[in-house]
Curated annotation (Swiss-Prot):
The keyword Ribonucleoprotein applies. GO terms for biological process: translation. SUPFAM superfamilies: Translation proteins SH3-like domain. The keyword Ribosomal protein applies. This is Large ribosomal subunit protein bL19. The gene is rplS. It comes from Salinispora tropica (strain ATCC BAA-916 / DSM 44818 / JCM 13857 / NBRC 105044 / CNB-440).
Length: 118
């Protein structure tokens, strides 16, 4: 095993849930302001997951006061306190850039229903 691969394996986070493009998530990010630290929650739809290993990132989009806001987070960042999956989205694409042009009900993502055991 390569030395860099060993370092990557040590730094990778295992406490995060499994999520993908189309899911609505709440990202609890730690923000440092001066000498104080607080947790800021950013809730939105995952537009993409990009990269692999330690350098993997994901893009979250939400509409705030009628303006689209997008934030990119590194998956393995220590600044992320935790990630909550609010709903699972049923989409057929890995990158949902087309949501940027859609407004209102057209921008709504179908919710994935889990099959109940019978």
């Amino acid at each position: 095993m390569n030395i860099l691969d060993a370092l990557d394996a040590q730094s990778k986070r295992t406490d995060l849930p499994d999520f993908r493009a189309g899911d609505t998530v709440k990202v609890h990010a730690r923000v440092v302001e001066g000498n104080r630290s607080r947790v800021q929650i950013f809730q939105g739809v995952v537009i993409r997951r990009q990269g692999d290993g330690l350098r993997e990132t994901f893009l979250v989009r939400k509409i705030s006061f009628g303006v689209g806001v997008e934030r990119t987070y590194p998956v393995n960042s220590p600044a992320i306190d935790r990630i909550e999956v609010v709903t699972r989205g049923d989409v057929r694409r890995a990158k949902l850039y087309y949501l940027r042009e859609l407004r209102g009900k057209k921008a709504k993502i179908k919710e994935k229903r889990e099959k109940q055991p019978s």
